[in-house]
C-alpha cells in the first residue's frame, strides 16, 4: 500500500498563492512592529521584572552583584538587595 494523502494542501501551493502573500505581507511586519513597541516602551521590562539598562548599577552600588559563597548565599543576597 502506498502512502496516502492527508487531505492538506501541499506547501508549494500555499507559498505560491496570492492569498498567502497578502495575509503575510501584513502580519509579518505587524509582528516586528509590535515586538519593537513592546521593548521600546519598556513594557517588556515591567512584565518580566528585569531591570532597565540604566538600572543595573545605582550611584550607591557600583560593584557587580555576585554571590561568592554558596553556603551564605541568602545573607549575601539580602546584603545586595537591602538598598533596592
From Swiss-Prot:
It is found in: Plastid, Chloroplast thylakoid membrane. Its main location: plastid. Heme binds at residue 24. It is a single-pass membrane protein. GO terms for cellular component: chloroplast thylakoid membrane; photosystem II reaction center. Keywords: Chloroplast, Electron transport, Heme, Iron, Membrane, Metal-binding, Photosynthesis, Photosystem II, Plastid, Thylakoid, Transmembrane, Transmembrane helix, Transport. PROSITE patterns: CYTOCHROME_B559. GO terms for molecular function: electron transfer activity; heme binding; iron ion binding. Its cofactor is heme b. With its partner (PsbF) binds heme. PSII binds additional chlorophylls, carotenoids and specific lipids. GO terms for biological process: photosynthetic electron transport chain. Belongs to the PsbE/PsbF family. This b-type cytochrome is tightly associated with the reaction center of photosystem II (PSII). PSII is a light-driven water:plastoquinone oxidoreductase that uses light energy to abstract electrons from H(2)O, generating O(2) and a proton gradient subsequently used for ATP formation. It consists of a core antenna complex that captures photons, and an electron transfer chain that converts photonic excitation into a charge separation. This is Cytochrome b559 subunit alpha. It comes from Guillardia theta (Cryptophyte). The gene is psbE.
